[in-house]
């Protein structure tokens, strides 16, 4: 099904959790609901074991990048902080592979979309 939303951004986020902390999709959902969202704000979540969880349908506006949600797809991977809580690339090989596969698929669906990180 073609997405009625005009997608020009694919935004990659991290959960901002420590490398030694488990943050399963259920914890992410509870966190987002506590913030007042009706569901997880991202369209996809990738856990440390590389499992990709579809969260919001791509046809639905996400809640992940203020002012950009209407025209973007949001992906989040579990982690992003080292053991001391400092920003770090904590992606596991499984996460990297899953993220690459997901981005490839989304780039086919949205060839004009720019892929960037949340801080970009």
Task: Give the predicted meaning of each segment.
Residues 1-114:
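Active-site-adjacent loop/helix surface patches within enzyme catalytic domains
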Residues 116-120:
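Short, highly charged C-terminal tails/helix-capping segments
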